[in-house]
């Protein structure tokens, strides 16, 4: 729009009168949740997803659309992002949480009952393997490398200028 220089936080507020209470369900007061300070991402795992309209759509100074177009597109962006996120979480959050739980349970089970016993077994066997490897190295590989080294150390190279 060109007139605003700071990012704006867009929020959608609805009065209690606009809710339909005919179903008998009681809706929570949105101000209670806003004041409770409940952070669902305390470790900032998804801080990269906190994008605003200005982070996605930007008009250079030389090309500005009409202010009303900019305001409407900003509002539609925020509302569609909000509505689509809510819509997708209604249908995907529970099945994906279920699948993630199954995946993490499977990986935990494999780690606890297969991988760690295998690693501990390897660590138990390694001292004897280390002893055998040291014996093979001392008996076969070390003399072979020493003889090759002595053979090459006796080679001398002389350069003559012709």
Curated annotation (Swiss-Prot):
PTM summary: Phosphorylated on serine and tyrosine residues. CAV1 promotes phosphorylation on Ser-23 which then targets the complex to the plasma membrane, lipid rafts and caveolae. Phosphorylation on Ser-36 appears to modulate mitosis in endothelial cells. Phosphorylation on both Tyr-19 and Tyr-27 is required for insulin-induced 'Ser-727' phosphorylation of STAT3 and its activation. Phosphorylation on Tyr-19 is required for insulin-induced phosphorylation of MAPK1 and DNA binding of STAT3. Tyrosine phosphorylation is induced by both EGF and insulin (By. similarity).
Intramembrane segments: 87-107
Keywords: Cell membrane, Cytoplasm, Golgi apparatus, Membrane, Nucleus, Phosphoprotein
GO BP terms: caveola assembly; endoplasmic reticulum organization; insulin receptor signaling pathway; mitochondrion organization; negative regulation of endothelial cell proliferation; positive regulation of dopamine receptor signaling pathway; regulation of cytosolic calcium ion concentration; skeletal muscle fiber development
Subcellular localization, as worded in the UniProt entry: Nucleus; Cytoplasm; Golgi apparatus membrane; Cell membrane
Gene Ontology cellular-component annotations: caveola; cytoplasmic vesicle; focal adhesion; Golgi membrane; nucleus; perinuclear region of cytoplasm; plasma membrane raft; sarcolemma
GO MF, one example: protein kinase binding
Segments on the Cytoplasmic side according to the record's topology features: 1-86, 108-162
Phosphotyrosine: modified positions: 19, 27
Membrane topology, from the record: Peripheral membrane protein
Taxonomic superkingdom: Eukaryota
Residues with Phosphoserine modification: 20, 23, 36
Subunit comment: Monomer or homodimer. Interacts with CAV1; the interaction forms a stable heterooligomeric complex that is required for targeting to lipid rafts and for caveolae formation. Tyrosine phosphorylated forms do not form heterooligomers with the Tyr-19-phosphorylated form existing as a monomer or dimer, and the Tyr-27-form as a monomer only. Interacts (tyrosine phosphorylated form) with the SH2 domain-containing proteins, RASA1, NCK1 and SRC. Interacts (tyrosine phosphorylated form) with INSR, the interaction (Tyr-27-phosphorylated form) is increased on insulin stimulation.
Record's function text: May act as a scaffolding protein within caveolar membranes. Interacts directly with G-protein alpha subunits and can functionally regulate their activity. Acts as an accessory protein in conjunction with CAV1 in targeting to lipid rafts and driving caveolae formation. The Ser-36 phosphorylated form has a role in modulating mitosis in endothelial cells. Positive regulator of cellular mitogenesis of the MAPK signaling pathway. Required for the insulin-stimulated nuclear translocation and activation of MAPK1 and STAT3, and the subsequent regulation of cell cycle progression.
Family: Belongs to the caveolin family.
Descriptive protein name: Caveolin-2
Organism: Ateles geoffroyi (Black-handed spider monkey)
């Amino acid at each position: 729009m060109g007139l605003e220089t700071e990012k704006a936080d867009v929020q959608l507020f609805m009065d209690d009168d606009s809710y339909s209470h005919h179903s008998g369900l009681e809706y929570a007061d949105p101000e209670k949740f806003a004041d409770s300070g409940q952070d669902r991402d305390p470790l900032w795992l998804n801080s990269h997803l906190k994008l605003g309209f200005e982070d996605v759509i930007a008009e250079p100074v030389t090309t500005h659309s009409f202010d009303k177009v900019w305001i409407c597109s900003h509002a539609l962006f925020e509302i569609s992002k909000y509505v689509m996120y809510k819509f997708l979480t209604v249908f995907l959050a529970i099945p994906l949480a279920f699948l993630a739980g199954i995946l993490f349970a499977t990986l935990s089970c494999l780690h606890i009952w297969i991988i760690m016993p295998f690693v501990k077994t390897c660590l138990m066997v390694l001292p004897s393997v280390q002893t055998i490897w040291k014996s093979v190295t001392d008996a076969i590989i070390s003399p072979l490398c020493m003889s090759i080294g002595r053979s090459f150390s006796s080679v001398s190279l002389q350069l003559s200028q012709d």
